[in-house]
Amino acid sequence: MTQEEMISAIESMTVLELSELVKALEEKFGVSAAAPVAVAAAVGGGEAVVEEAKTEFDVILASAGDKKIHVIKAVREMTGLGLKEAKDLVEGAPKAVKEAVSKDEADKLKAKLEEAGAVVEIK
């Protein structure tokens, strides 16, 4: 069977038949069809592809800046921590303020902390 004949046969298959073919090939050769697609996307898109796929983000306080008291107040408001815990978190920067939050929430927290004078990263 030539390549053209194989391509022609694949073109005439239904989606269900193609899905079954892929599963059979994965089992036969011990591979995953998803891996090559992910590698190709990462090569082409680089950092943007990783960002789009990520759904949970960590808000990291990199530095309190020169308005430490305002930053402590903002951290207490966001996290519900007591004064001592919030102060320890701010003084121990870089530290995670919140982990595994949505992109929208991470952006809001970052804006609020930066408004208070902090340097913030989202990872």
From Swiss-Prot:
One of its GO terms (molecular function) is structural constituent of ribosome. This is Large ribosomal subunit protein bL12. Keywords: Ribonucleoprotein, Ribosomal protein. GO terms for cellular component: cytosolic large ribosomal subunit. Disulfide bonds: none annotated. HAMAP family: Ribosomal_bL12 (MF_00368). It comes from Magnetococcus marinus (strain ATCC BAA-1437 / JCM 17883 / MC-1). Forms part of the ribosomal stalk which helps the ribosome interact with GTP-bound translation factors. Is thus essential for accurate translation.
